[in-house]
């Protein structure tokens, strides 16, 4: 298959996941796998939907719901890898926090803002 070039404003025709450059440049995040960094970008993107839907907890913190199955679909990976990447973001980097809801409901995911220290 041969692809054509971009012409003029065509370069703006796609939507993109935004991954903060600091995840690649800051020594604190160097140990994170590239897949975990990509997943963080996907989770940040999902936050836009949560903001539109006003998914806020009692402390006005934005949360997302993104199941393991959705991660597997987004990254074309197996369950084990999806779970490992979430653990990497949560335990190793502290970039997300999960809150279990119980009763078979998916966990709430808080995507952390690493640019602001609390």
Question: Which role does the model predict for each range below?
Answer:
Residues 1-69:
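Short recognition helix of helix-turn-helix/winged-helix DNA-binding domains
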Residues 47-111:
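Winged helix-turn-helix DNA-binding recognition segment
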Residues 115-118:
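Charged low-complexity intrinsically disordered patches
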